[in-house]
Amino acid sequence: MYESGLKVPLIIYFPPKWRHLAKVSSGKEYGLINFTDLAPTVLSLAGVRPPKHMQGNAIYGKFVNKGKREMQFALASNQLHHFMPVRAVTDGRFKYIRSYIPYRQFALRNYYQWGMPSNQVWDELILKGGGNPEWGQPFQSHPAEMLFDLEKDPDELHDLSGVSEYEGVLCKMRQALSAHIRVTTDLGFFLPDSRIGHILYEKVRQERYPLAELYALVEMVGTATIDLLPVLEEAITSSLPEMRFWGVVGYAKLAKEKRIRTCPQALLALIYDTNPYIASEAAYAISYLGRYQKGITRLLTPTLEKNRKIGYSSLECLSLDPEMREYIRPFIPELKEAAETLPHVENEDAGFMARGILVNLGEMDIKELYGAEAYEKGLKLNHTRRAMLPLPN
């Protein structure tokens, strides 16, 4: 959710035949533009008024929108098997990033990106204790809220969310994002498997799902204090899986921060929840409450094989925490067996995740992460690619 991945130049070229449609001379524009603006712009250039239900603003043509966008929003939900919703908003000067599961590190791997040598070298450097604090930020838990001054800090390294001078800006950005989530009926806080068998957009409307309560809970758990415990106790006993999951997230945050030390029976029972996301998150939480063996065993042994990668995601999260590695080490033989016997060729294979956890524990060199078969397949794929056609003329 950083500018290095979001801020992409938009280059618009009008061939001579159509240059009259631009109605502006060549130059640069520094306004806030996003993908939703493309369709209205094409219609506007064709002389068609964009329908009212269409998102985005026409930036050229007969129906150009002359008003400037004040806020730009961004979202992310999944990093392959890592469910970790993040939202962001910027006004061009300040950037606000909201992480709803802040203990999930941004460096949790996806295995197409980690095929790049630069990512592997970065991992190796940080896991061996090298680099500076800024380089190590993605490998650590992070604040639920982060605020950056893009003019003074374009690389987004210095979080201002705790600086009293910027409290007004922080509040403004927080409110803007909170309102946007509700106006757009953001469904990104539902568990990935909740989309199976139906259209979630229709389901929440037909069943009158309590979205207001869900949004309120989601926003509270990332900044949870012990004062929220009564809310969390109620949430983890809800009949709605989303409420149970986000209640567990609140417990996990408090447990990791050592604000609670006793494991509630209701939380312990959730490691056997029928929903694998809830079970894995509960196993993660109890691992920070002294139930290391029970929690880690649950993450390594899914009820169904198809859910293995969900548990491995939480285990990878644990393995990036130096304090937790000693509790994972007794399970190294099982991880090594999984690394060898489970598939580790395709991007989403569980064997890659087992190997990645071993790398985090210092039990495998990161150069061994992929193995010869995956490496050869990657070479073959990239050697057969051709240049993009057609080119502009």
Residue ranges and their predicted role:
Residues 70-75:
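WW-domain-binding short linear motifs
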Residues 65, 77-80:
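Short, conserved micro-motifs composed of acidic
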Residues 4, 35-39, 52, 56, ...:
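A structural signal for well-ordered alpha-helical scaffolds and beta->alpha junctions
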Residues 2-3, 80-162, 168:
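C-terminal, low-complexity/hydrophilic appendages and adjacent surface loops
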Residues 15, 42-50, 63-67, 98, ...:
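A generic secondary-structure signal for well-formed alpha-helical elements
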Residues 130-144, 152, 160-393:
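Long, internal low-complexity/basic segments
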Residues 1-69, 158:
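Substrate-binding rim/cap in mid-to-C-terminal beta-strand-loop elements of soluble/periplasmic
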